[in-house]
Amino acid sequence: MRSKRDITYKKILSLFRNQNGSPFFNAKGLAIGVFSGCFPFFGFQTLIGVFFAKIVKGNIVLAAMGTWISNPFTYIPLYYFNYKVGSIFLNNSSNKILEKSLVIDDLWKQGRIFSIKLLLGSSCVGILLALICGTIVFFIYKIKSKR
């Protein structure tokens, strides 16, 4: 007897396998989706990925699937890593808020700094993961098209 999880897994895998278009078209779509999935815009990542896939003429279905890199199981590690990468690029310590007395202006400043670090780190990690995933998918579809 098959479980519901096996059927869903097979459907998703067949959806990935049965995409038409050139390898570059499919790779662009997935890369845009992975890039969009690295940003902390919960609920809008798929919309952003599909929007940008339409702009660059990439595969919309693979763009939507690429945003699944960010899911409830990966939110905390992914965004923590993105924040740390952003902190490295901005080169300032991230825990200075505990050393100060909490004033509203300080909270706004810390929120702005936190957001900038997270978005910068998300951009860097997103570009790297998009390049890696896009390259892998390009070669997968290139090999598939030769068969």
Regions found by a protein language model. Give the residues of each.
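Transmembrane helix boundary and interhelical junction motifs in multipass membrane proteins
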Residues: 39-52, 56-80
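Small-residue-enriched transmembrane helix starts and helix-helix packing motifs
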Residues: 11-14, 18-36
